[in-house]
Amino acid sequence: MTQAGTRSTNGDTENTDILAQARQQVLERGEGLSRDQVLQMLWLPDDRLEELLALAHDVRMRWCGPEVEIEGIISLKTGGCPEDCHFCSQSGLFMSPVRSAWLDIRSLVEAAKQTAKSGATEFCIVAAVRGPDERLMSQVAAGIEAIRNEVEINIACSLGMLTVEQVEQLSGIGVHRYNHNLETARSFFTNVVTTHTWEERWQTLSMVRDAGMEVCCGGILGMGETVEQRAEFALELAELGPDEVPLNFLNPRPGTPFGALEVMPPSEALKSVAAFRLALPRTILRFAGGREITLGDLGAKQGMLGGINAVIVGNYLTTLGRPAEADLRLLDDLQMPIKALNASL
């Protein structure tokens, strides 16, 4: 499903006024857009896209600065997940080619080393689980200790839903940031996942924040949600107030319920990037999975000039990403400095 709802028909003058109002509100005062204002941005005609992206870039530069945060991710435990997230090839409930596997500690350390060599300040350890059991928590603790002995990098984790005790344990071993995506608007969530609730995810995020870890929470666009629901999602994230929002775009995976969905049109994806920046002016907004197939090289450049200030380099969990060298070359071409580790501690 692409753009839906009743669009404004008053022409370029109204669109210009909308952008002028957004410039005053977000750029000058640092106040994020409301749901209805985000919706207006998503409804802008394509001939206003360049102006929208320019405004989002100005907002990013004003409230976040020119630096770009680089992150690498690694799957500690792949596949065999009991949850039914309809976009995910790691679910054990679907006829996916992905099979369950564990990464050994030595390989985890080597991956962290390679990530650090790319200039990254963040290394995220991910596991395909509903939530971690004792074995996984022990493996994560051992992996983090091994990485810290050899690599200077911030460590993040994404291990599903947590208990209070697990949150405290991760905080205690020095996890810098915890990722748990809400994935989509609350009103659309049951179309994406049925084995747990949106509220359960929110609860984990609240506990993470209370424990003093940074919160990383975003989602996937292009899963059949309406444009109204994209605006709803942006404001739900603004209410949560995460330190980082990773924006993924659906890359339909064979064997999953969403495997036959169409890829999101590039103009919609770029409008979404800009609109989310205007809703979240001070948040780290990260290009994540699906940008390669959705936007290509040109769209990646437009996104970096349209509100994005962080990227995941290298491959994702079960799909190929852009080579790290390509992203680093793009940042160099755009004269965007990479955030240094000592600036992020």
Curated annotation (Swiss-Prot):
Using the record's annotation, list all stretches that form the Radical SAM core domain.
66-291
Q: Does the keyword S-adenosyl-L-methionine apply?
A: yes
Known cofactor(s): [4Fe-4S] cluster; [2Fe-2S] cluster
UniProt keyword annotation of Nucleotide-binding present: no
**Positions with a binding annotation for [2Fe-2S] cluster:** C124, C157, C216, R286
- Cofactor: how bound: Binds 1 [4Fe-4S] cluster. The cluster is coordinated with 3 cysteines and an exchangeable S-adenosyl-L-methionine. Binds 1 [2Fe-2S] cluster. The cluster is coordinated with 3 cysteines and 1 arginine.
Which pathway does it take part in? Cofactor biosynthesis; biotin biosynthesis; biotin from 7,8-diaminononanoate: step 2/2
Enzyme Commission number: 2.8.1.6
The protein's UniProt keywords, in alphabetical order, are: 2Fe-2S, 4Fe-4S, Biotin biosynthesis, Iron, Iron-sulfur, Metal-binding, S-adenosyl-L-methionine, Transferase
SUPFAM superfamilies given in the database record? Radical SAM enzymes
Q: Tell me the GO molecular function terms.
A: 2 iron, 2 sulfur cluster binding; 4 iron, 4 sulfur cluster binding; biotin synthase activity; iron ion binding
Q: Which residues form a coiled coil?
A: none
**Which GO terms fall under biological process for this protein?**
biotin biosynthetic process
InterPro entries found in the cross-reference section: Aldolase_TIM, BATS_dom, Biotin_synth/BioAB, Biotin_synthase, Elp3/MiaA/NifB-like_rSAM, rSAM
| Matches recorded under Pfam families | BATS (PF06968), Radical_SAM (PF04055)
Known catalytic reactions: (4R,5S)-dethiobiotin + (sulfur carrier)-SH + 2 reduced [2Fe-2S]-[ferredoxin] + 2 S-adenosyl-L-methionine = (sulfur carrier)-H + biotin + 2 5'-deoxyadenosine + 2 L-methionine + 2 oxidized [2Fe-2S]-[ferredoxin]
Residues given in the record as [4Fe-4S] cluster binding sites: C81, C85, C88
SMART domains listed in its UniProt record: BATS, Elp3
Chain's role = Catalyzes the conversion of dethiobiotin (DTB) to biotin by the insertion of a sulfur atom into dethiobiotin via a radical-based mechanism.
Q: Which family does it belong to?
A: Belongs to the radical SAM superfamily. Biotin synthase family.
Quaternary organization = Homodimer.
What is the name of the protein in this document? Biotin synthase
Record the organism. Answer: Mycobacterium leprae (strain TN)
The gene is bioB
